[in-house]
Amino acid sequence: MWDTVRWQVLSSDEVEVAPDHRALAWRELIANVARDTPLDYTFRTMLQRADLENFDYNTPIVYNVKRKELIVLNERMRAALQRPVRRSDRTINANTAHVFLLFILAVLLTVLVAFSPWPDTRRVTAETRTI
């Protein structure tokens, strides 16, 4: 992808996409990130259609060579392109089978406790000793 984009040197550490190649670079970057995005419902891209339609594709893209990181100067795109490394811990994926299994286990446990043979503590056995 980045082979077709022309770069220009900013400093000894940073290079920038040339102004005439920025639109192509942005489209390729957004397409690659969208393609690599997980398809489960626990992931939020924060990318909306209006962001793509009204986006200024001449915004610079800077690459830091030493740290090997892409510097995006647009805040909305930076938030959308920074994907989480792992899933959210607060998200619980429970399907109908899990809920049904939990209900059956709760009913069985209730029946087991209600009808289990417990020793009768009201009956006192008296032992008599004869000498």
UniProtKB/Swiss-Prot annotation:
Q: Which InterPro entries match?
A: PIF6 (IPR008005)
Q: What is this protein called?
A: Uncharacterized 15.4 kDa protein
Species for this entry: Orgyia pseudotsugata multicapsid polyhedrosis virus
